[in-house]
Amino acid sequence: MTDEEASTWDIVRNPKFADRIFIKDSARDVYSQLILKVKEQEVADGKVTMDQLMNFTSDADIAAVEEYMKEVKPLVAGWEADFGKDQMVQELGYVNLTWSGDGVWAIDEAAELGVDLRYALPKEGFTVWFDGWVIPKYAQNVKAASYWINFMSRPDIVIRNVEETGYVSVSGAPEVRDAFTDEEYDPIDLSYFFTPADTAVCANPVLYPDKADIERSTQEHDWGENTTKLIEMWSRVKGDNANAFTYILIGLFVLAIAAFAFFARASKARRKKSRRRK
């Protein structure tokens, strides 16, 4: 696979990688990426921003993404929530629409096996996301929850958490920056994350993307009243993703059952005939 092939969302409908593509089984994640692809010309023409696209859930928008996904579906080896990274490490998959933390894990695991995996951020744009600790309005132990959040925000704990999960924290503490500075990587602009002076930090770009990449990103939004329509579209797209081999297995299974039933019936008939002779 070339860097050029991996630089665009069109990679997920590239027949060169048929049956080696794994897509997240997540309607929101997939739709939010592909609406950026489908509407890329409108973004380029300045008619709409990527942030605005995250609210594009009209019938026409949904139909456009569905049409694109119909081209993707025949090439998909699996819709996954967790096993895609393993397929990549084992070289059973060549393309995986995945989360950055899973990407970090897969790249590290593959390197130990001599497999070169890379993480790409498509030129059409992509979404960034975050999970956050919150204290519910009616929480009964606010003090304990506050202690927990403060604990998880400590620089030393942040470092351990990133090392364990592959996902970064929002903490831009100097200790965190220093812990993940590695001369193995080329300098990148992380002034948006740490301090304005951090314009050339040697860090893993999968963990901390360059500022220029972040400027091509946006955030997903809740679909509101259109959620049902989008989920229905997702169900139509996924539908039956069985490939030819799957149908062969199903056919053989059905034949085996039919053969078993036939021989069982024949055997029973022979036993009855034998008893009558006696």
Q: Model-predicted segments: where are they?
A:
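Mature extracytoplasmic/periplasmic domains
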Residues: P136-D213
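Conserved C-terminal helix/tail region of periplasmic/extracytoplasmic solute-binding proteins
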Residues: V201-K278
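Solvent-exposed loop/turn segments at secondary-structure junctions
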Residues: M1-T2, D19, A27-Y31, G101-V104, ...
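Non-transmembrane alpha-helical segments in soluble domains
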Residues: W9-R13, S32-I35, E66-K70, K85, ...
